[in-house]
């Protein structure tokens, strides 16, 4: 209907940088998943066209700014939906092109939206959820690398292995803590450096407390996985349709608070992996434990690894700023009807930056070992 088409066009008011292609693919996938449950009131042809987009890598151009994270991700999902109507732009075969031309090239007719379909496409948390899923996958990888780099740093710093023994962690049985301690022991098994007698009694916290800090981040990742698994297997549309009960309910499943909180939490957990890693880097270049200052033979003549630590510190500081929770803010909109919003989209895009930052900090730590 004309109303549904107008809804899509009027809500396509996003701005800022483009959403990365891998995130757009996830948005499409998650929207297809949500609509497939049959509580959204859409025609089969609309869902099939979204599947066509996904399978043929026809990726709508979507922008990062514009969603309040309640009433769903209205602006980003409007941009996702425009190409269904032959409007907007898509990325296809590596180039951004008008959607109408790509649809014509592929022999696809624009979809004529029926009653409720515009709302079904615009309402939903798929923008936030796509960022969350991407970040979760990256978090697992970065958590594993943080343990490996932490173990190598401990070895290089002539650290003690005793704080990583099972006995210590079984009396404070956080799952992530125990897992991390065992990872470190396994990674350093057979090392002559870690096994040799030590002069010092204790290591700095950034080494000694690897299980407690890395472990807490692991437990956070597990929690966020549970939240996102529930979210992406849900209907987050409004109003929701129950055909068997002959019932349509206007409710609030579009509100992004569950994942907004989770993504803020995950950003903090990942930033801490970067923060503690940078501190170990600093210790390695400090001239302690018979290591040369800045890890260079002639520190007066050469700067060695002095400036890479500056870079890591700068990135860590930026991540700390990005960890200000987005979900604590709410600005009323729609003449006060939408008087509490999650700001989950801001949590999502900040989380993306924290993930990238943490990867860079870990890479910088690795080159110091």
Regions found by a protein language model. Give the residues of each.
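Accessory "access/gating" subregions that flank catalytic or transport cores
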Residues: 154-275
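Glycine-rich anion/phosphate-binding loop at the beta-strand->alpha-helix junction
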Residues: 70-79, 224, 228-327, 333-334
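Short beta-alpha connecting loops at secondary-structure transitions
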Residues: 130, 166-170, 209, 250-251, ...
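Conserved small/polar residues in nucleotide/adenosyl-binding loops
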Residues: 367-369
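Active-site cavity-forming subdomains of large catalytic enzyme subunits
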Residues: 12-20, 24-171
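Active-site-surrounding "flap" and adjacent substrate/cofactor-binding loops of secreted or lumenal enzymes
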Residues: 2-11
């Amino acid at each position: 209907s004309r109303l549904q088409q107008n809804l899509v066009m009027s809500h396509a008011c996003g701005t800022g940088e483009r959403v990365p292609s891998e995130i757009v693919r996830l948005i499409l996938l998650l929207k297809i998943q949500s609509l497939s449950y049959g509580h959204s009131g859409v025609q089969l042809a609309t869902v099939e066209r979204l599947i066509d987009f996904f399978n043929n890598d026809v990726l709508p151009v979507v922008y990062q700014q514009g969603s309040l994270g309640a009433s769903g991700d209205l602006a980003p999902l409007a941009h996702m939906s425009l190409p269904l109507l032959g409007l907007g732009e898509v990325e296809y075969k590596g180039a951004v092109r008008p959607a109408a031309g790509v649809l014509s090239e592929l022999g696809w007719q624009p979809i004529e939206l029926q009653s409720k379909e515009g709302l079904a496409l615009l309402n939903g948390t798929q923008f936030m959820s796509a960022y969350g899923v991407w970040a979760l996958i990256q978090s697992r990888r970065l958590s594993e690398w943080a343990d490996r780099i932490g173990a190598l740093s401990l070895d290089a710093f002539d650290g003690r292995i005793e704080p990583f023994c099972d006995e210590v962690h079984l009396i404070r049985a956080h799952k992530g803590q125990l897992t991390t301690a065992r990872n470190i022991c396994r990674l350093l098994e057979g090392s002559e450096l870690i096994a040799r007698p030590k002069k010092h009694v204790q290591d700095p916290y950034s080494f000694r407390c690897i299980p407690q800090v890395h472990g807490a981040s692991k437990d956070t990742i597990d929690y966020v996985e549970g939240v996102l698994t529930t979210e992406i297997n849900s209907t987050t549309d409004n109003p929701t349709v129950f055909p068997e009960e002959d019932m349509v309910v206007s409710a609030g499943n579009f509100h992004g608070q569950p994942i907004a909180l989770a993504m803020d939490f995950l950003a903090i957990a990942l930033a801490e992996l970067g923060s503690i890693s940078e501190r170990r880097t600093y210790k390695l270049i400090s001239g302690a434990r018979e290591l040369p200052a800045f890890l260079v033979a002639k520190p007066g003549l050469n700067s060695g690894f002095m400036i890479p630590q500056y870079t890591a510190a700068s990135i860590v500081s930026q991540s700390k700023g990005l960890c200000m929770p987005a979900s604590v803010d709410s600005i009323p909109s729609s003449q006060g009807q939408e008087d509490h919003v999650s700001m989950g989209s801001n949590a999502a895009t900040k989380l993306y930056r924290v993930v990238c930052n943490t990867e860079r900090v870990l890479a910088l730590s690795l080159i110091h070992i």
